[in-house]
Amino acid sequence: MTVNDQARAVLEKLAGAPALEKSTVFEARQAQWGFLAFQGAPEPVARIAHLFVPGPTADLPARIYYPEGDGPFPAIVFLHGSGWVTCNLDIYDVALRALANATGHAVFAVNYQKAPEHPFPVPLDDSCAATAWLFEHAASVDVDPARIGVMGDSAGGNLAAAVALKARDRLAFQVLVVPALDVDFTTRSYVDHANGYALSTEAMRWFWAHYLGSSPVSELAAPLRAAVDGLPPAFVAIAGHDPVRDDGERYAAKLAAAGVPVRLREFDGTIHPFVLMDGVLDEYRVLLGELRTWLGEL
């Protein structure tokens, strides 16, 4: 399995960039704006609602991206990635617009509070509170409460999986894209892709240390360790050249063994951050087309 030409070109551009794990939190947050250079033009959507939703300790900025059509809309609660530490809704704007248009779902994106200032369980508690808010206020935002699911990429995939564990009886589906699901750096993907693939094993150690803080590893922090019986149908997407690849693969296998309907999709030639690189990597747009079909079959 080799890196495809598009991913190789990205890696060449990233060569020589400062190691994230040697950065301060401020430096890492500033560096994440570099993703914008790899993104395509933002698509128009029918409308975007900007709002704040109450979290347990703070009001949380949120947006709802609406596709064309008449509601009430099925909805995706989207929890963004970047290690529980960095990124925001502005950096994900292009991806969120495309998600709404491709799937025909309203996309409810939440800017949860970040570690290390707000370590576990704060980002998860924020995510759960925002999800509960959408169920409670679905009618007022033109959403069908019977068709709400959760989605996230990377650290957001971790949060989405944990939200599904806590709200398994309410959610219609879960979509986990390149999810980081356990604190186990001995897997083959962590060893084989320790360096040189846009996300390093040491960077993941840095992210996990900030997220966990002084908390012990629990099933909600590391959903791969949780019981998964009765969870909603899942779509798990992984990248072939990604330290966290095996997390998603193992979780999909665990879901299947528990009788949860699951589709595992491996984009074998690409790298971890493809959701934020749609201007130079094809995989996110391919994923959106497949998600549209999968969601239509539920």
Language model feature labels by segment:
Residues P72-S82:
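Short beta-strand element of the alpha/beta-hydrolase
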Residues G152, G156, A160:
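Gly/Ala-rich beta-loop-alpha elbow adjacent to hydrolase catalytic centers
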Residues L165-S215:
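Hydrolase active-site cap/lid region
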Residues G279-L298:
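Catalytic active-site module of serine/aspartate enzymes centered on a nucleophile-bearing elbow/loop
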Residues M1-I64, G296:
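A glycine/proline-hinged amphipathic helix-loop "lid/cap" segment
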Residues F135-V150:
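Gly/Ser-rich "nucleophile elbow"/oxyanion-hole loop immediately N-terminal to the catalytic nucleophile
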Residues D90-V110:
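Short amphipathic alpha-helix adjacent to the substrate-entry channel of hydrolases
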Residues V236-I238:
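Short beta-strand/loop motif that positions the catalytic acidic residue
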